[in-house]
Amino acid sequence: MTTIKLMHAKLHRVRVTDAKPDYVGSVTIDSDLLEKVGILPLEEVQIVNLNNGQRWLTYVLPGQAGSGMVCPNGGAALLCKKDDILIIWANEQCDRAEVLENGHKAKIFVADENNHCREFLYQILNPNQGSVEFHSLPVIPEGKTSEYLQQMIETNKI
């Protein structure tokens, strides 16, 4: 069995709301954001700071639901400052043969300046004759179908 590591969840362009160097390691994230993409408390995540290029590996602690909180703790707090923009993602080990046979789906939360959902995507690997095809599909907000599609067309996203 050959295993591969695939991204299964990503919080894209979230804004740092606080940084606590004296707190014991980790990153504290609004539990609603974690639930939306399927990242579990204590799950290992990788983080890149888009403001300075710093990268690190840590684990997640759940923060207050609905707060928009993204707070690197411990040593990671020295790699960023309030209002920096981060990409946070979690990977999972997958059996390569199963991915080629059944595909794979990752959830992507794209944040606005307040860490609310600006866009939500599924990035999908669809099986195709021993290989996979990659697709990135926006989830259309309920009741916004024509407005949302028009916006996507105008911004050249579809």
Swiss-Prot record:
HAMAP family: PanD (MF_00446). This is Aspartate 1-decarboxylase. It comes from Trichodesmium erythraeum (strain IMS101). The active site is at 26 (schiff-base intermediate with substrate), 59 (proton donor). Binds 1 pyruvoyl group covalently per subunit. Heterooctamer of four alpha and four beta subunits. One of its GO terms (biological process) is alanine biosynthetic process. Is synthesized initially as an inactive proenzyme, which is activated by self-cleavage at a specific serine bond to produce a beta-subunit with a hydroxyl group at its C-terminus and an alpha-subunit with a pyruvoyl group at its N-terminus. One of its GO terms (cellular component) is cytosol. Keywords: Autocatalytic cleavage, Cytoplasm, Decarboxylase, Lyase, Pantothenate biosynthesis, Pyruvate, Schiff base, Zymogen.
